[in-house]
Design a protein with these regions (language model features):
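Terminal, low-structured helical/coil segments at or just beyond the last alpha-helical repeat
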Residues: 201-268
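Boundary at the C-terminal end of the N-terminal hydrophobic targeting segment
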Residues: 18-22, 27
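Short coil/linker segments at helix-helix boundaries
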Residues: 37-58, 80-114, 119, 123-155, ...
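Bacterial N-terminal signal peptides
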Residues: 5-17
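Canonical tetratricopeptide repeat
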Residues: 76, 126, 169, 220, ...
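Positively charged n-region of N-terminal signal peptides that target proteins for export
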Residues: 1-4, 20
Length: 268
């Protein structure tokens, strides 16, 4: 189970809060809208600098007084805290304590977002991931936080079964969860394929709403194909991920090199 939670957490690491499609969060107001869009730009495609992430968080905080966008404000403050935590952890184990505090803030903001708008599927997806990230830092809390993570993802799926991010994260869970606990590699693969179809249909309608996840869907699709020994399909999926996001370091520097190494070992 912890393997699923850690994998689910990773999918949100450095996720790009780009322009967006409609989502069931609250309606927005013009002044706060501008702050949210500006903050998203500061976060950047791959998290940007630590200063940029803190600046984005400050912009999001200024939107909280606007009841029309408060749910979005809390959502993006949570996303900023989540990505700051990832940045700190990548910089070294000595930052574990500070990262833990940012993940705590992530959960608190997402809980507020769902209190303001109980239909906020995007917030429930990120909340599930945040719980998983907390388990990675403190496995002793796995039993309690694991149930919360599963509950949050289930709620997201109930609210927005065709949301591509919900479908992607559900597929990651299915792919990484052992069969004795209800997981299935085949079910996971089918989920990745469905998520790819849904992302292809996603059309931006509001610059506030999240649309991250398209390139990551192909990264996971490639992983699933490689697990089945279908290396050419895996390579095509990884290349598709890079076509969508050329700076996708996970694919460029980890997944593709691992695939090429596996291919050379299989060569006659």
């Amino acid at each position: 189970m912890s393997r699923f939670l850690l994998a689910l957490a990773f999918v949100f690491s450095l996720a790009a809060p780009a322009s967006a499609q409609a989502s069931p969060m609250l309606a927005t107001g013009s002044s706060a809208d501008s702050l949210l869009v500006s903050g998203k730009q500061m976060l950047g495609e791959n998290g940007g600098s630590l200063d940029a992430m803190y600046a984005a968080k400050a912009a999001f905080e200024r939107t909280l007084a606007d009841t029309g966008v408060a749910a979005w404000g809390h959502y993006y403050m949570a996303l900023a805290d989540y990505r700051i935590a990832d940045y700190l952890l990548a910089a070294g184990e000595e930052n574990k304590g500070a990262a833990s505090e940012h993940l705590k803030a992530t959960v608190e903001h997402l809980q507020k977002a769902t209190e303001i708008n109980p239909q906020a599927a995007e917030a429930y997806v990120l909340l599930s991931s945040a719980y998983g990230r907390q388990i990675g830092l403190n496995p002793i809390k796995g039993m309690v936080l694991g149930r919360r993570a599963q509950k949050a993802l289930k709620k997201a799926a109930q609210l927005a079964p065709d949301n591509p991010r919900v479908v992607l994260c559900t597929a990651i869970r299915d792919f990484n969860t052992p069969g004795m606990f209800g997981g299935s590699k085949e079910k996971g693969l089918q989920g990745f394929q469905r998520a790819a179809e849904l992302f292809a249909q996603e059309e931006p309608t509001n610059p506030i709403h999240p649309v991250w996840g398209h390139s990551r869907t192909y990264a996971w699709l490639g992983i699933a194909y490689q697990d089945r020994g279908e290396l050419e399909l895996a390579r095509a999926a990884f290349k598709k991920a890079l076509a969508i996001n050329p700076s996708f370091g996970w694919v460029k520097y980890v997944l593709l090199p691992e695939l090429e190494k596996a291919s050379s070992l299989d060569a006659p």
